[in-house]
């Protein structure tokens, strides 16, 4: 089995280099010609615009940058043949597509013009859309210190292309030094890429991830993992089926903390993992207000570990492992002037089986997880917004030893739970708009433009619904949004355990480039 896995890995490496060029294929999307030139019918006056039917006929792209057309089509859900009744609904459609593309922070600006043609024989009006986009600056290589009370210091040179090959998907490259919460040092290297491309008129994605650590304080200092995968989307009527396959290579994989007592710190040596998966997104065909379409998505994935001669797998790695999951939800969250606006809700359930434990007395082969969550973002004024998240999580036949991940101010590992209800509340104030490019009417100064947000927050959680089992934390976040570089922002968070300020280390710090939720 290991030899087969190696062959699969070699094939995937070949596909990786092939995929580097695939995004530049002229087979970008239906309705786009090779030279992206479309005949635009002359506009006409509307006799009864509210009764007219408009048909999306074509898309023309005017791109200032290197973003690819197929990426815009995918992100904007741009489909020809869509019928829209009423002129006001046509304008809403154009506004919606403009906002949908602007939500992608790899773009600096988006503008869509539309041209209405003469009625066809069936009385419907063809509509041609001209889409103007300008890329923001997306390439950066900077030393970035990052600190989290949960994982320690991470001082890393981070190279990023947030619009790699114009696919609107990032390429991440890290080289750095880490000092974790247990006082252990390591040198790290990471390469992470997902490359979407069009082939055979289908959407594909190539995944290539490499992680290398040198850990001198550990018994096995060298760690390496490679994941190489390929997935494809198959449209089926109004639904989408996604099928994929990942192949992993592991060297000296560290065991989860929950397994170390029984199986030691490491799975020593080399093993490989084959991971086929499939999911099916089934829209219900109606919108939940303005917050997106309700969709049900079942999925199944499996993991088969392959050992090498002389390097047997430990019991916790033997498997095979099967996961059945499904979700029901909707979401639409927009970026408006560096504030978030929108709402999303989801019910998610995951069920896992470890087949190697089924016939072993005292071993539990099954585990399950359920997550019910809702996230809302509201803009009150141009300087103030409110964000909130409600979440219920429960683990069956197991527990989560990092359940504090929903609380800023309490270390993740300090909370072990098999049930948790949590609420997060953020009060987002824009306290500074630093715009020298506007003040001095000089666009060359846009490099120094930024917005500064100050965000008091409160997080609470309970493992059971009683007043004796409540956790409460709070603090402040500061987020810097550079205008010149929309795809990058810096978040600094400081939170405290508000129920016990007497504890010496009752705080949690985060410095990084991701939002909390």
Model-derived features with residue positions:
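Bacterial N-terminal signal peptides
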Residues: 10-19
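Compositionally biased non-globular segments, especially hydrophobic aliphatic-rich helices
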Residues: 5, 21-22
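Bacterial N-terminal signal peptides that target proteins for export
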Residues: 2-10, 329
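Generic detection of long, well-ordered alpha-helical segments
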Residues: 91, 268, 318-319, 363-365
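Gram-negative/organellar outer-membrane beta-barrel architecture
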Residues: 106, 111, 122, 126-336, ...
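C-terminal transmembrane beta-barrel domains of outer membrane proteins
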Residues: 2, 25, 70-82, 321-323, ...
